[in-house]
């Protein structure tokens, strides 16, 4: 689940696998598809390899809240086409745990790769 303020802009990127997005509130779009705004109640399926630039319009009157499901890695680029980032399950877990610890929101439950596990709340 992600919450983004009006004006949020992510670097151009693609996913090596599929991505699915369900929008709970607000509005977002891909810059490459300005005629396809996603608003509360919308579901988007995105095939792997689809290149796009995610943004929330600056004139949104509320935060945009989405549930994201991604398979594989996310590969992001700078405006000049150079590599900006590679996010995968391991890097996302690290960032999530680091931010959670900094905010004091408690441990984040994960089933770690290599073995089945139980997430305790």
Model-derived segments and spans:
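Ordered hydrophobic segments in well-structured contexts
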Residues: 1, 22, 65-68
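A short glycine-rich, His/Asp/Glu-containing loop-to-beta-strand
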Residues: 1-11, 40
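Glycine- and acidic-residue-biased ligand/ion/polar-headgroup-sensing regions
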Residues: 6, 15-33
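Histidine-centered active-site/metal-ligand motif
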Residues: 13-15, 52
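Short acidic-glycine-tyrosine-enriched beta hairpin
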Residues: 20, 30-53
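Long, hydrophobic, well-ordered secondary-structure blocks that form the structural core
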Residues: 25, 44-49, 68-70
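Double-stranded beta-helix
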Residues: 57-121
């Amino acid at each position: 689940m992600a919450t983004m303020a009006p004006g949020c802009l992510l670097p151009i990127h693609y996913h090596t696998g599929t991505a699915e997005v369900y929008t709970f509130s607000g509005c977002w779009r891909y810059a490459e598809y300005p005629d396809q705004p996603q608003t509360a109640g919308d579901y988007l399926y995105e095939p792997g390899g689809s290149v796009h630039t995610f943004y929330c319009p600056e004139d949104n009157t509320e935060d945009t809240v989405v549930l994201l499901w991604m398979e594989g890695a996310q590969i992001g680029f700078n405006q000049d086409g150079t590599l900006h980032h590679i996010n995968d399950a391991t890097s996302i877990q690290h960032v999530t745990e680091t931010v959670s610890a900094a905010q004091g929101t408690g441990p984040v439950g994960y089933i770690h790769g290599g073995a089945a596990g139980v997430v305790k709340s």
